[in-house]
Amino acid sequence: MTSMTDQAARKPRAEDVASPDAIIKAVYEALSGPAGKRNWQRLRSLYLPGARLIPIGNRVQAEGRTDVMSVDEWIDDISAYFEEHPFYIREIQRHADRFGDMIQVFSTYEASSDPEGEKKTRGIRAMQLLHRDDRWWIVNVMWDNETRKNPIPGEF
């Protein structure tokens, strides 16, 4: 259950949650930037209370570890890295399937420490979205980076 204080802290920008395209764009914008603090309140506002983030495979902070984390746990885990390192991530391809108010999205991304530089990492985010209360929410996100043993399939 979410308290009124939690709900107020999660108040989104209307344009960030108006459509599936908008919420996915907002996630990538909230994560990208030069070394320093991110707008964590903006990021939190995109997620349904109780949402889970599941980084798998090679991770910046803990290679090979798989954790199921709340949004706040993930922010606690990664914020020191973002404060010390520039990180730019953008979507390069998307596959989405919708049924009613739910959407399963496979979002292929590339990430780099330089917004104009060579790509450093590519991967896929599996995102589940839900339309409730006149807005879109992110319910869960699981992602993995591409490796030689785990290349991104052609359809993605």
Which residues make up each language-model segment?
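Surface-exposed, charged secondary-structure patches
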Residues: R52-L53, G57-P115
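Short beta-strand edge/turn micro-motifs at domain boundaries
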Residues: T2-S3, R122-N150
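A short, polar/proline- and glycine-enriched secondary-structure boundary/capping micro-motif
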Residues: G64-T66, E116-K119, R148-E155
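Short, low-complexity N-terminal intrinsically disordered segments enriched in polar/charged residues
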Residues: M1-P49, F156
